[in-house]
Amino acid sequence: MTIETVSENKAFGGVQGVYRHVSAATGTTMTFSVFVPDHAPGATLPVLWYLSGLTCTHANVTEKGDYRAACAEHGIVFVAPDTSPRGEGVPDDEAYDFGQGAGFYVDATEQPWAGHFRMRSYIEEELPALIAAEFPVDMARQGITGHSMGGHGALTVGLRNPGRFRSISAFAPIVAPSRAPWGEKALGGYLGADRAAWRPYDACALIEDGARVGELLVDQGDADQFLTEQLRPELLREACGAAGIDLTLRMQPGYDHSYYFISTFMADHVGWHAARLG
């Protein structure tokens, strides 16, 4: 695998880069960003994955996420992939919550999406192999986080791969997409009408079906316009309570769904992951 450098800029003593490569999983060119803090020659660093939300690319968190100072302080590599395949020949939908920019971190089985929308394979298999080959990372020390649709991605990828991730957190995640309009539309469109096929992509369903991790951290603004209909954090609290998973769910007064919220608590999440990644 080879990558092309789109840009590299010095930041907080390290390098913030944007890169692209041809993906076998999606059959498209994919773009992602990586922040590598300053480090000793030959050292390998823990890595924190960040999965973005609906309509986003890698650029949203890269430009507005305010993670670099904390990652530089703690010596953590920060990786931000795109949210879907893009480009000529890639199917799309006019709605903001389906198609390009709304991959939901699934491997689609329905047409016309199945040919390119293989974000689960991309995030779980292809991109980690590329990052391990090209950057100074210690793949035995991985954490994952994300926002909204990406919070759903972080929770489900983490729950499906408990041996890979030492730490899992989320900002305003869609915790039970099978019981939320965004999720029902996306999972039905990408995976078909059989709801059994949706369960590996639903954090609460995964926990109900036996997935276990030691702990989870979730921050949620109580002024989030999507709180009651789409996000429903109380369902995750119920699922974790029944399963004995240590969930820290922090309802943050007055915060909405935006990057103003994410950037406020990003350094805290990076520090929380750092304490678990060593």
Please give the residue ranges for each predicted region.
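Non-catalytic cap/lid and distal C-terminal segments of serine-dependent acyl enzymes
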Residues: M1-G278
